[in-house]
Amino acid sequence: MKNIVVLGSTGSIGVSSLDVIDKLGAGYGVLALSANTNADLLIKQMLKFKPRFVAVLNEDSYQKVKPYVPENTKLLPPDEDSLIFLASLPSADLIINGLVGAVGFMPLVTAIKNGKTIALANKEPIVMAGKSIMEECYRWKATILPVDSEPSAIFQCLQGTPAGRKEEDISRLLLTASGGPFFKYKGALSRVKPEAALAHPRWVMGKKITIDSATLMNKGFETIEIMHLFNVSLSDIEIVIHPQSIIHSAVEFKDGSILAQLSQPDMRLPIQYAVTYPNRMPSPVKKLTVKDMAKLEFAAPDFKKFPCLELALWSAQKEGAFPAVLSAADEIAVDAYLKEKILFTDIPKLIYSVLKETRSPSGKITISEAAEFDVWAREKAREFLANKKYKKTII
């Protein structure tokens, strides 16, 4: 039996993960669940999967869940220490980190220090302190299995390459992006409302990552993530807009050969690969047909139209604290946009305003430094929101 902890079980990744586990059936069990505010869904999940542990971070949701806890399930206190506890459970064989934003940082670090295998959808911790986190992975013999479709595609394409030769054999990583809902949009992006930005043409995801996909910040985050997961430089990665989301990414090797991973755009497939790794099992995901692949489009990203991507690549090149600041400022900006406090086009302005104020050490930063810069950047972003200084920013 593979015992699985699902952090963020009521979010998009968590719901898909539980669907995968349910359909796999025998041999896969849910050891623990965590959620924040969606008490109703958590209650349903808890009663169906009967986990040994449940964590609810939000106090009101905690009180709502409490009467429904099964006899053999332990409800943990409503705080982030409970996430740390779940990430370090000795009996956990796999930790699925489907948390959103920096809240997943310390649970990831904890799981790594306990030598766990982590199915990682929460890319922000790698963005914040990728070099230090990967060093901890090697030190504690932990394993990170990428769950996002594009990093998972690259991971799968590299499975036939001997571990010691991966970096030596790679010529280029082709990182695909759908382009989001505004790839061909001709109108003024400043007028775009959250409901339009949340209408992703290919993927069903949580609100934060869907807005990041609309601004292309998500692709910038994935670029930074891929640099660290596969130990490649920024110059080794080429971002390609591919609206159909059939080719999830590709690897070009030194001899000119290109291996790509193709499938329907359904997050259950990369999740299942991480859950069953290194094995493959039958999946409920619809199979590709030749007709599906008849018309595949490709284009270069438009950095002028989507400045968030350029900010992310700039931060990746600068290294130090800049990626951590980028991640934190983006989280504040996206939240403000979803609450209609700022315009869609204000998102990169607010992020850039915070990046300009950053005084970063050169090179690698430690895990504790990343956490400190995360706090600082959030405070600075909120300050700019309050005084509206970001409005005058020209990118």
Curated annotation (Swiss-Prot):
NADPH binds at T10, G11, S12, I13, N38, N122, E124, G206. It is an enzyme of class 1 (oxidoreductase). It catalyses: 2-C-methyl-D-erythritol 4-phosphate + NADP(+) = 1-deoxy-D-xylulose 5-phosphate + NADPH + H(+). InterPro entries: DXP_reductoisomerase, DXP_reductoisomerase_C, DXP_reductoisomerase_N, DXPR_C, DXPR_C_sf, NAD(P)-bd_dom_sf. Its cofactor is Mg(2+); Mn(2+). Keywords: Isoprene biosynthesis, Manganese, Metal-binding, NADP, Oxidoreductase. Its EC number is 1.1.1.267. Pfam families: DXP_redisom_C, DXP_reductoisom, DXPR_C. SUPFAM superfamilies: 1-deoxy-D-xylulose-5-phosphate reductoisomerase, C-terminal domain, Glyceraldehyde-3-phosphate dehydrogenase-like, C-terminal domain, NAD(P)-binding Rossmann-fold domains. Signal peptide: none annotated. Mn(2+) binds at D148, E150, E222. NCBIfam families: Dxr (TIGR00243). HAMAP family: DXP_reductoisom. Belongs to the DXR family. Catalyzes the NADPH-dependent rearrangement and reduction of 1-deoxy-D-xylulose-5-phosphate (DXP) to 2-C-methyl-D-erythritol 4-phosphate (MEP). This is 1-deoxy-D-xylulose 5-phosphate reductoisomerase.
